[in-house]
Amino acid sequence: VNLLHLESSGSWGGQEYRTCLEINWLNASGHRAWLICDPTSEVLTKARELGTPVIPMSLRHRINPLVSFRIWLFCRRHRVDLIKTYSSKDHWLCLPLFLCGMPVTRARCITDPLGKKNRAFIYRHGCAKIVADAQVIKKEFIEQYGIAPEKIEVIGSAVDLEKFSPKHDPMKFRREVGLSAEIPIIANIGMIRPDKGQFNLVEAARIVRHQRKDAHFVFVGEATGGRSREKWVRKAIDRAGLNGNVLMMGYRWDIPDILAAANMVVIASRHTEASPIVLREAFASGRPVVATRVGDVPEIIVHGENGLIVQPNDSNALATAILLFLSDAKLAARCAENGLRYAREHFCFDRMMRAKLDVDLALVEASKRRRVRSEAAPLAPIASPEPILPD
C-alpha cells in the first residue's frame, strides 16, 4: 500500500516523532510511505535525520488551491492509495482530494476541545476515518459533536520495546552530568510549552527540595515558539533557588540512557496530552511514573499499582507523589515492575502499526470497490431528440 502523511506542524514533538517512526516502519515492511511537511519547520530537519522520505511543501495556510493541486499531483504520480492527516491545516488542504474520492484519515492526538461545534465539520464530512489516540477523545466526539462511533478508531501510541528496555547502562548519563548513583534523578521529558506543566513541576521541585536537598530534576525537550518559553522556565527555576538542582538538557536522541539513569519519570501535563509517548517509554524502561490525570493516563495507570496519578495543576500533589517514591523503594520497585509488564503486553510498536495498517487497508479496499462499481455502472441512454416537423 502507498501512504502519504502530511504534517503541517512547525515544531518537533512526540506526535511528529511517532509519525516519522510509522513512515519508516511502513517502508521497512514493504510498503511505500512519504511525509509532506513545511520547508521552514523543525519537522523537516528532524525527519531527515531519522531517514524519513520527506517532501517539502508550504503548509502554512488551510486553504491553498495550488498546494492542494500539488498534493494531488504527487498522489497521481506515486499512485498513493490513502492520505493521513494530523492537524487542521493539512486536513483542509486535503479536503478537495477527499471530495474527489481519495481516502483521507484524520488523526486526533490531543484532548483539547474543538471549541465551536462547526469545527467538527471537517471531521464529520472531510475524512473516511478518525484515528484517535485515546478513548476519552472518542467519547467527546460522540457526545459533544455527534460523530458516529463507527467512524472513530482508537489506537493508542506504542514504542519499540527493543530500544526502550531496562537493559541500558544507568550510569552513562549520570557520568555525563556528574551525578553519582546515590543522587535521585527525577526526569521530565517533553516539549517545553504551557500545557506540559513544567512550571508546576518547578514548584513541585521547590517543595521536594525542602525534604530531599539531594534530589535533581532533569528537563529534556525543546521549547516551542522560539526560546522565550525556555527562558521563562529558567527564570522560574532561578526564582525558586533551584539552579543547582535542575538540569535543562534541550532536545536529546539518547532518551533510553536518560530513562535508565532516572529514579522516576514525571508527566506534569495540564491538558492537551492524549496518549503520552513518554509514559510508554518509561514503562518499557522499567521506570516508576508519576503522571497527571490527562488523556489516556487514567486508562493505563492504576494508582499505587503501576504508577502514581495526581490531578493536573497541583504542584503539592506532584511533590507528595515524588517524595513517596523517593521514600518508599518497595513501592517504586513494584510500580516499575508492573509498568514494565504492562508495556510488554500493550505497548508493542509492531502491534500498534499492524492495527493502524488494518484500518488503512480496509479503507483502501472500500475505495477500490466503490471505484469499480462506479466504472461498471451502465450509462443512462441518451434520449432521442423529438423530430422537428415542418409547419
Task: Give short role names for the model-derived ranges.
Residues 13-21, 184, 188-207, 217, ...:
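A conserved mid-protein helix/loop that constitutes part of the nucleotide-sugar donor-binding site
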Residues 303-304, 308-315, 324-330:
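Conserved acidic donor-binding segment of nucleotide-sugar-dependent glycosyltransferases
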Residues 230-250:
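Nucleotide-activated donor-binding/catalytic signature segment of Leloir-type glycosyltransferases, i.e.
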Residues 99-133, 145-146:
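A conserved, positively charged/aromatic
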Residues 136, 158:
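Carbohydrate-associated surface elements
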Residues 35-37, 288-291, 301:
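Short hydrophobic beta-strand element within catalytic cores of glycosyltransferases
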